[in-house]
A protein has these predicted regions:
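Cleavable N-terminal targeting peptides that direct proteins into the secretory/outer-membrane pathway or into
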Residues: 1-27
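Acidic, small-polar-rich N-terminal luminal/periplasmic segments of exported/outer-membrane proteins
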Residues: 25-166
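Outer-membrane beta-barrel domain signature
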Residues: 122-123, 147, 173-174, 224-226, ...
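Outer-membrane beta-barrel translocator domains and adjoining extracellular loop/strand segments
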Residues: 126, 211-218, 262-268, 327-335
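Extracytoplasmic loops and strand-loop junctions of Gram-negative outer membrane beta-barrel proteins
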Residues: 139, 167-170, 215-223, 281-288, ...
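Transmembrane beta-barrel wall of Gram-negative outer-membrane proteins
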Residues: 168-170, 175-207, 211-263, 298, ...
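Flexible loop and strand-edge segments within Gram-negative outer membrane beta-barrel domains
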Residues: 248, 253-297, 329, 337-345, ...
Length: 375
């Protein structure tokens, strides 16, 4: 699949400059926090963006104990983010009732997921663990003008931190019920003072299952019978270069490996074929397929941001993402070999985006060109 998109947005600002300055002064006097977002492909004050957007900062996420992107729905109204059937890392996303309930590979979802403005084309592997994040932006409503065909419901933007230039090292551990053990390590090292920085992050997230597979087909032999368990490893490396105050370059690599078991469904009625009763727990299931599951996601991106003048800035983003999923979906939830789908999803895509932002005293322009090629 290859697609090319061009987008231009312009706005005339007719309000008197004095009035705008006066409003700004009033806000400063009231002590309102200035929250910057990039919902319209340019840095703006959240209070002044004419888009329905929720911005959740890293401090807010940490204070609320949020570790995965599905929990962001607590902060954003009219937003549903859930792990889908089959795997723990396949995302079902709805905003204002628009989305894709069945996360079929090969179909464009109704809500776009972006990592530093790089589009994640498939729902497989889109349940992102929050590692080295600066903020999450949730844009509600159609965003097709600036984000393309896949955002009729909205868009969710995962924005990672830019490095401060100081040596930093952070270790975070979380322990919980069902033997939950989460470890995250993040840090940054200046390679050349005030110019070149290396950032890194690594996470290991493990948890026993909420339920179990009560019966597994006998011909499969010994199987791990935990259902809804978690075994995820995520890594990120970033190289940032600032040769001048006007030029910024970033090379970033990220990887996610999900070895959690396949997620078994819950029976609402007893089986007519096996007489299997309805499980006591909604997390218990039956299956005739192997319980192992593997999801691998890798991404590489390059960003160049150049401030030409006080009024004009240019940005170029090139990216390549690869995904591979080997999972098993048992639709009938019995130990019989019927309605079973051993699924393998394998995809790769590349994208190139060029953005231009111009802002004068009473005129703003956002223009861009986008090329996407996926298979």
């Amino acid at each position: 699949v290859t697609s090319i998109a061009l987008a231009v947005t312009a706005a005339l600002i007719n309000q008197p400059v004095l009035a705008a300055d006066d409003d700004s002064d009033k806000k400063k006097k009231k002590g309102l926090e200035v929250i910057e977002v990039t919902a319209r492909k340019t840095v703006e004050n959240l209070q002044e963006v004419p888009v329905t957007v929720t911005s959740i900062s890293a401090d807010d996420l940490q204070e609320a104990g949020i570790s995965v992107i599905t929990e962001v729905q607590q902060f954003s109204p009219n937003t549903t983010l859930q792990a889908s059937r089959g795997t723990n890392s396949t995302l079902t996303a709805f905003i204002r009732g628009v989305g894709q309930q069945d996360p079929l590979w090969g179909y464009e979802p109704g809500v776009g997921i972006y990592i530093d403005d790089v589009y994640m084309a498939r729902p497989q592997g889109a349940v992102l663990d929050l590692l080295d994040v600066e903020r999450i932006e949730v844009l509600r409503g159609p965003q097709g003008t600036l984000y393309g065909k896949n955002t009729i419901g909205g868009a969710i933007k995962y924005v990672t931190k830019e490095m401060s230039g100081e040596s930093e090292f952070n270790v975070q551990g979380t322990f919980g019920s069902y033997n939950q053990t989460d470890f995250k390590i993040t840090g940054q090292i200046p390679l050349v003072d005030d110019k070149l920085y290396l950032g890194f992050g690594h996470a290991m997230l493990k948890r026993d299952g909420f339920g179990e597979f009560l019966k597994v087909a006998s011909h499969l032999g010994n199987q791990d019978t935990e259902n809804y368990n978690k075994d995820v490893t995520a890594s990120r490396l970033t190289l940032e270069y600032r040769p001048t105050d006007d030029l910024f370059m970033r090379l970033a690599w990220d990887s996610t490996q999900d070895d959690s078991n396949s997620k078994g469904g819950y029976r609402l009625l007893p089986s007519l074929l096996t007489d299997a009763p309805v499980p006591d727990s909604v997390f218990d299931s039956y299956t005739s397929l192997p319980t192992e599951n593997s999801v691998e996601m890798d991404g590489l991106s390059f960003t160049l941001d150049y401030t030409v003048s006080d009024a004009l800035s240019l940005k170029y983003i090139a990216a390549k993402r690869d995904g591979y999923s080997d999972t098993n979906i048992d639709f009938d939830n019995t130990d019989l070999d019927i309605f079973d789908v051993p699924a393998i999803y394998d995809d790769t895509n590349t994208s190139h985006e060029l953005q231009a932002n111009y802002a004068s005293e009473n005129f703003k322009l956002v223009a861009g060109a986008y090329l996407y090629d996926g298979e």
